[in-house]
Amino acid sequence: MLNYLATQDESKCCGCGACVEICPQKALPMKPNKEGFQYPALDANRCVDCKLCEKVCPEMNPPQKAEPLDIYALQSKNAEELFESSSGGAFRLVADSVIQQGGAVVGCVWNEKMEPVLTIADSLDGLRPMQGSKYLSSSTEHTYSQTKKLLDAGRMVLFTGTPCQCAGLLNFLRKPYDNLLTMDFLCHGVPSQMAFDAYREHCEKQRNGKMSQYKCRDKSAHGWAISESYCVNGKKYTAHGMTSPYLFGFISGYFNRYSCYTCKFRGLERFTDYTISDFWGYQQKLHNHDGISAFQVNTQKGKEFMTRFEQNARYHIAKREDVAVENPAILHSHEENVPELRKTIYQQIQTDGWAVVEKKYLRCRHFYLKKLWYALPDHVTIKLRKLKH
């Protein structure tokens, strides 16, 4: 099979960066395309045709997958960590245990330019910025090679990332490590940095200041729901997912990288030790609205390690069908057509600006009614929902 470097077919590159790090000649720098997605750019003068880039490419050589051993509805008992988590705090449960045993954790944080990047933490304090979803493409930086050094030195490492980033790491390592744990999540695709920056700059222009402390998921706004928040000039602004133009575009699949639409790594079968996601709908069974994770244990190694943190969690055995009610990607590989608006939106962001694109394409049905609804206090909306039923 021909890869992206041979075809320049953007759907054949997931942007994991494994080829960049494995190249002994440094002949594959990552460069953004017009839409802001990073792709390897071959320097033919440096290339010695060693084919290592092809060997580690997860698009060409996806890791072998297997069905999960167990699926749980899981929630951390630590109220503070639960509040800061997007759903049930599954990441912190595993990560805390790894750190407490002298290990290191690879996770995604915002840098000073408001770009998501993978970094390595070896303290509990370093885990806090890794919590919470970041709904755009992240850079792996040099974390594959740094992870390998830690593993070779005998340190335990928890590597967390998108499914394709985890696949890139496993291919980069080229052998199994007993001291490695991997955790991915049910991924809905990744927007580009350019799309997010256009939205951020639009918000900054509206608010006359610089954005900081952006959160894709903020429980202080509407509890466990998809609600964004950010600060400008010390003032906090919030929006429910369907009234945020950026999150509406993300949920609708308008911003995704082309490889996301034919992702090889979706579905119930996985190659990581753990897979986490929101367990939407399960809160009715538990009468708990603080956030619940669907926690999928995929390997025997993951099952054995769970005994080290299970006492810090509330959990129940669940069925895959329970998760699939609101997360159909857990059962299906979910190949889908590229939305017709996708190319138009990216083109018009560049030519007309975010404000035009937002007004034309990024407003949900009944936009103003939804804005009014989510402006109401929680106790009012709860009473209105009860009246409806």
Residue ranges and their predicted role:
Residues M1-E10, A41-N45, M242-I251:
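Short, intrinsically disordered, charge-biased short linear motifs at domain edges
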Residues M1-L2, N45-A153, V323-L341, Q347-V357:
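Flanking helices and flexible, charged tails adjoining ferredoxin-like Fe-S electron-transfer domains
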Residues L2-L5, A18-A41, K51-P68, D273-Y274:
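Iron-sulfur cluster-binding cysteine motifs and their immediate structural context
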Residues S11-K26, V48-M60, T162-G168, F255-L268:
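Local cysteine-cluster metal-coordination motifs and their immediate loop/turn environment
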Residues S86-G89, E112, F159-L169, G189-P191:
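Gly/Ser/Thr-rich loops at beta-strand to alpha-helix junctions
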Residues Q101-A104, E204, N208-H389:
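Long, compositionally biased charged/polar accessory segments in the mid-to-C-terminal portions
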Residues L170-L181, R200-K205:
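Short, surface-exposed basic-aromatic patches at helix termini and helix-loop junctions that form
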Residues L181-H202, N327:
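Short, flexible loop segments at boundaries between secondary-structure elements
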